[in-house]
Amino acid sequence: MSKMNKKLSALFLALVLVLGMTACGGKATDGTTGSTDNTVTAEEEDHKTQNTKVDPNSPITEDMLRNHAVAPAEDFTYDVEDDGIKIRSYTGSDTVVVIPEEIEGKPVTGFYDYVFANDNPVRAVLIPESVKELEQVFTNNESVELVICEGVTIFRGLTFGDCSNLRQVILGENVQELVGIGTFTNCCRLMELHFTDALTSIDDEENFYGCDNLTIYGPADSYIESFAKEYEIPFVVE
């Protein structure tokens, strides 16, 4: 990406460093989120599958993640909101995490910042299609390798920023925007991303800063093709 800006501003570097050192905050229960104080430690709920062991020395494949056990509700703390469940933290021990589609009979619709960030040891996460936006969920996580997030339409700054071991992000067909900066910044092992005509806005080329091994795939004559060519990111028509 020789034409891409090869340096971040001092402000952006400071922001990444600060965010990389920020803790998840555990089971916070204050009312600063704009919703009523419904934070709970998830009670045990019925689930049909049990966790299976994953070899820590072997890469995790898409099939492995898709076929893995759904995490039980008690592995999370969360807020019960009018339109669904917003997850605050992951407290389980499994490093491969399939987020449940529902908790307490309500759809999982979002995450607070840093749920899987920093030193969280998760290696792979499958996010249900009921989640439409992500922001700073995985920031500065050096363990995560694979994320499936096929329902997300909007990514906000630093969703995957500084995830240096991230190899694969499987997107859905309806990604519309990369808002702000740093969505995939310094994901140096990320090999490919697939976008469709639904993508119409990328706020800044630094969303792909440091992605030196990345190839972007997308439709001919699309917004993403024009963007990739402008900033000399390898692009393949599909």
Language model segments and positions:
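Bacterial N-terminal signal peptides that target proteins for export
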Residues: 1-12
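Structural signature of tandem-repeat unit edges
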Residues: 75-83, 92-109, 120-133, 141-154, ...
